[in-house]
Amino acid sequence: MTPQEMWNAYKQINPSIGDEIDAWAFGVDPDLLADLVFTGEKTATASAYDLYALEDEPLHQEGTFDVILDSQDQAVCIIEITKVSVQPFKQVSADHAYKEGEGDKSLAYWRQVHEDFFKDCFGEAGLTFTPDSKVVLEEFRKVYPL
């Protein structure tokens, strides 16, 4: 299903969502992570704050809706953003790591894989990642299909 087709189907249930679609795939292993969202295992994500600023891209806002895509840019589900916060990488909580639903869901696992990921992203942008680098933490819930 295309993002537009899924959006149109959900709009029949929730007409207030409007016409503008924000569709995206997770940067690493989009099929696995999209499936974790679909099954309800993954209800949070993290991204690099400095990259939003570098690309002059606004942060997601609570109450907005996104279409989650797989690696083939096909729609998997629609989520509603329920919480957005910014904090240093080193202050991310075990609770947030658990909500991300990846690996063994521990903070140690989360820190290991996200530090590697953020170092690569920062390096590609000519920046240096440190434990004090800010991350954008988002929580969400799947709203379609239920």
Q: Which residues fall in each region the model found?
A:
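Mixed-charge, low-complexity intrinsically disordered regions
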Residues: 1-78, 87-146
